[in-house]
Amino acid sequence: MTKSIYFSLGIHNHQPVGNFDFVIERAYEMSYKPLINFFFKHPDFPINVHFSGFLLLWLEKNHPEYFEKLKIMAERGQIEFVSGGFYEPILPIIPDKDKVQQIKKLNKYIYDKFGQTPKGMWLAERVWEPHLVKYIAEAGIEYVVVDDAHFFSVGLKEEDLFGYYLMEEQGYKLAVFPISMKLRYLIPFADPEETITYLDKFASEDKSKIALLFDDGEKFGLWPDTYRTVYEEGWLETFVSKIKENFLLVTPVNLYTYMQRVKPKGRIYLPTASYREMMEWVLFPEAQKELEELVEKLKTENLWDKFSPYVKGGFWRNFLAKYDESNHMQKKMLYVWKKVQDSPNEEVKEKAMEEVFQGQANDAYWHGIFGGLYLPHLRTAIYEHLIKAENYLENSEIRFNIFDFDCDGNDEIIVESPFFNLYLSPNHGGSVLEWDFKTKAFNLTNVLTRRKEAYHSKLSYVTSEAQGKSIHERWTAKEEGLENILFYDNHRRVSFTEKIFESEPVLEDLWKDSSRLEVDSFYENYDYEINKDENKIRVLFSGVFRGFELCKSYILYKDKSFVDVVYEIKNVSETPISLNFGWEINLNFLAPNHPDYYFLIGDQKYPLSSFGIEKVNNWKIFSGIGIELECVLDVEASLYRYPIETVSLSEEGFERVYQGSALIHFYKVDLPVGSTWRTTIRFWVK
């Protein structure tokens, strides 16, 4: 008998909530459009497609002609639409109720627009945890696709993976297909004949096997060099022609069609996992380095093929431990979710939950070779939607809440007024973790800490050429000299932190590493008290250090669009004290070099990316997003300011990313015995 094998091609198309229109348009022109146009001309070649809900909404609005083409392909049975969480959340980190609702939302959208009831779903970043079976099944889904690494880790071999299995949780069943890592690296990078050879190797006479590639649509045109190879040089045309030429060997098929023809291979219980690269990225830098050394050792000793299934890496949720900013966003999402769920108004709840769903979009919560967490506009979008959700709720009063917000074992204080949210950390020197301007749904202090990443060691041998490689194998840089701005912070970049310097600081030294200049920096636990009346709320932090007492107050008002911050330093020793005192605020208004975004100091404008030292009683920030911030000081300070820039990886290589601006206000404070120095700073936001 003739050997044969089914082949199923799945295309996953996604854009993050908050991404720029021009970025999505470029992805459309280079990938989404030419790929569907190609398969539209090949109606006998079935494909599976997953579009995230955010991208579908964008396509429906901006390219209705594309929608019409998808409808035709669905009607003729060529396309099988695959569902997922509507806004592409990482399912394990959102509330269980939302797991089901996000999937059902996309199910309904696909049915309403294309007339299909999805049977399968795409799992965002293929992040799998065993309990998901129950919630996915409750949403009406019959199968998911995950990486073959999940299967290898429980002892299955490559020859066992050309079919599908059944998973079970509390009696709920869900089919699961393995995505071939081999095909992920062959398509569309290798000669199409190599794919045919690989499929031939595992073909069988009983016609029961299937090989699955389900991967990013962006790799067909948007990834570096792929538009040229896939379309201009004809890789895709050659690939499909090769499949058709070998029709006796290879049968293209949709996944659900295959399920109706072939029984499952058995029952399986998969561990927590994602694709192999993700499980490397989630590790801390030293652990990543050790994993790389282990992999290299196994390869050198020709043991990799045998033992690689058991070399797993980390666990996705640990991104919430690796990056405080990621954890903060996720805990804010849970906090806002709880407030929305407690609302007695169902109409308000529905509108607010739509914002929460968008605030669950996965992209800003993690980082690998894609920008992710390092992209300020993606973090900004998460905060925008979560603050908008809060704004649907009752906001006319001032209130506070004390609890362990970020689940680190220490209480935080959340203060809310009609204009602002302040997230305060007594355990981190009474600093501000988050400062929201609710009128514009904008987090003013959305700044990322400069951290060491494992890939920073690769900067020494980057190149401008990396053609023909998967983006997982490329080391390129978008500009020269990035190693010269590679600095690391020794604390999280929060605001209203205090420092005592040995002498008047040097700006360049502050920029590189302010901790080297500090005699004291106050990141330990502060005592606090809260006073509230019907018009304002005051949170006072205090501590005694080296003979002086430091007090810091935040005052929010019910009907005022400003915040007062008051510092008092009292000499409680028996000798006079002289201090080089400074306090720091870190702000991010997103556009460091745009003419509509600038500092105004005196009558001079400076880009947000600029360095400077000025004597000030006030300064302003103007932004193109319609927010103006003014800082008014009653005691003149020396203002030291510099841009906070990170070096991170994206699909196009190493890049510089503006994360915000640091503003350190410096004072020489002389304190006779028993005396107190005091200053009030008022921040107007409008």
From Swiss-Prot:
<dbReference type="GO" id="GO:0005737">
    <property type="term" value="C:cytoplasm"/>
</dbReference>
<feature type="active site" description="Nucleophile">
    <location>
        <position position="125"/>
    </location>
</feature>
<dbReference type="InterPro" id="IPR052046">
    <property type="entry name" value="GH57_Enzymes"/>
</dbReference>
<dbReference type="InterPro" id="IPR011330">
    <property type="entry name" value="Glyco_hydro/deAcase_b/a-brl"/>
</dbReference>
<dbReference type="Pfam" id="PF09095">
    <property type="entry name" value="AmyA-gluTrfs_C"/>
</dbReference>
<dbReference type="InterPro" id="IPR014718">
    <property type="entry name" value="GH-type_carb-bd"/>
</dbReference>
<comment type="function">
    <text>This amylase is a highly liquefying-type: oligomers appeared at the beginning of incubation, followed by a graded decrease in the amounts of maltotriose, maltose and glucose in prolonged incubation.</text>
</comment>
<protein>
    <recommendedName>
        <fullName>Alpha-amylase 1</fullName>
        <ecNumber>3.2.1.1</ecNumber>
    </recommendedName>
</protein>
<dbReference type="GO" id="GO:0030246">
    <property type="term" value="F:carbohydrate binding"/>
</dbReference>
<dbReference type="InterPro" id="IPR004300">
    <property type="entry name" value="Glyco_hydro_57_N"/>
</dbReference>
<dbReference type="Pfam" id="PF03065">
    <property type="entry name" value="Glyco_hydro_57"/>
</dbReference>
<comment type="similarity">
    <text>Belongs to the glycosyl hydrolase 57 family.</text>
</comment>
<dbReference type="InterPro" id="IPR015178">
    <property type="entry name" value="A-amylase/a-glucTrfase_central"/>
</dbReference>
<dbReference type="InterPro" id="IPR015179">
    <property type="entry name" value="A-amylase/a-glucTrfase_C"/>
</dbReference>
<dbReference type="InterPro" id="IPR011013">
    <property type="entry name" value="Gal_mutarotase_sf_dom"/>
</dbReference>
<keyword id="KW-0119">Carbohydrate metabolism</keyword>
<feature type="active site" description="Proton donor">
    <location>
        <position position="216"/>
    </location>
</feature>
<dbReference type="GO" id="GO:0005975">
    <property type="term" value="P:carbohydrate metabolic process"/>
</dbReference>
<dbReference type="Pfam" id="PF09094">
    <property type="entry name" value="AmyA-A_glucT_m"/>
</dbReference>
<keyword id="KW-0963">Cytoplasm</keyword>
<dbReference type="GO" id="GO:0004556">
    <property type="term" value="F:alpha-amylase activity"/>
</dbReference>
<keyword id="KW-0326">Glycosidase</keyword>
<keyword id="KW-0378">Hydrolase</keyword>
<dbReference type="InterPro" id="IPR028995">
    <property type="entry name" value="Glyco_hydro_57/38_cen_sf"/>
</dbReference>
